[in-house]
Amino acid sequence: MKFCNPFLRLILRRKPISMISPTMFLLSSPTTSSSIGHSNGMLRSRSEDNLNKLGECMDNMDEDVSKLFIEFQQTDLREDPDLFRLLNHYFTTSKGVSQLCESLRTCLERSENNECLLLDEALVDFELEKLGYGGSLEEASFRKTYRDLRNFNAFYNNNSGEEDDLDYCEFLRKFQTCHEELAKMVVKLEKTMKDIDKKLRRVRGRRAIVTAALLAPVIAVIFLSKLVAGLVPIEGLSTFVASRWRKSTESLKREKTAMSSMERGIIVALKQVEKISKLVSRLESVERSISLTAEFAVKKRSSVVVAMREVEEERKRLKSTLVDLDRETGLCNGFAQFGRTVALEKITEFLSRGDKSSK
């Protein structure tokens, strides 16, 4: 609410914006009272109510959409609720991808600082204990190695019930939500693009029909009288018609460009999220394999050497997967931010042209 206060008084002076969403229907201008003594108090009270309600609505908007909403007061953004909701959904979904990446980075740091550290300790203790008995594996007890492996298994198995695993649960929740919203956004943008194409085809068809309808009577008169032909501004009439249809066509093309930039950004983000999903599955598989190997080594102590070799190989796979996940997370976040930047530029261009033409 505090964030919106500098702009709200300016907005309330503009034309009504109750078409944006159902919550804004309450923002109607206050009716005057017949009682002069109470009119000032009533107007002040209703203005404050409107200000609070508008502030609550602005709080539910995405930050970028709020800026567009404030800046371009003479455009379709205020009078087209579908466009407003589409922009709000787009920026919210795209920023959800960045939040997903932040959540995943937290999980990766936890895995690096806990699981990898426990495995490194087990491998180091194994080598030290093996050397401590002069390489004689039969005499080595590997007490520290078994302890480290038990610690790893305890962390891995009990982690689902501890507070540390809340980070991973939060990541899974955000991942499911993010993936669903991206898929919905792709469908919405595809439908919007098809609607714009239909409008463009209708505009071109109407242009031909209207031009013919306007010029047909003039041409008929020309055939009847050469004198009238010299007085009728045929070229000016056709130029006027062409300019009006050209403005409509250019506006639709700018809108299509803005929607296209949003669609490309969402598709790239969706592909990156799916890549991350595959890498997360691979990470879970590696961790599960290490846990089973460690459990086998603790129970079948005679096979500790073979088990530790497998643990060493799995440790390399774990490290490689973490590196790949970190790289893809950075790319995903970067693509999402870049997509929002490009889309915001195209949307601003589309709205600013509409704002200038309306003035």
Swiss-Prot record:
What main location does UniProt list? membrane
Which UniProt keyword terms apply here? Coiled coil, Membrane, Transmembrane, Transmembrane helix
Q: Where in the cell is it found?
A: Membrane
According to the record, the signal peptide region is none
Q: Which domain of life is it from?
A: Eukaryota
Residues folding into a coiled coil are: 179-208
Q: Which positions, given as ranges, span the membrane?
A: 214-234
Q: Which GO terms describe its cellular component?
A: membrane
Query: How does the record say this protein sits in the membrane?
Result: Single-pass membrane protein
| Record-linked Pfam families | DUF677
Q: Which family does it belong to?
A: Belongs to the UPF0496 family.
The name on file for this protein is UPF0496 protein At3g57100
Q: Lineage in the entry?
A: Eukaryota, Viridiplantae, Streptophyta, Embryophyta, Tracheophyta
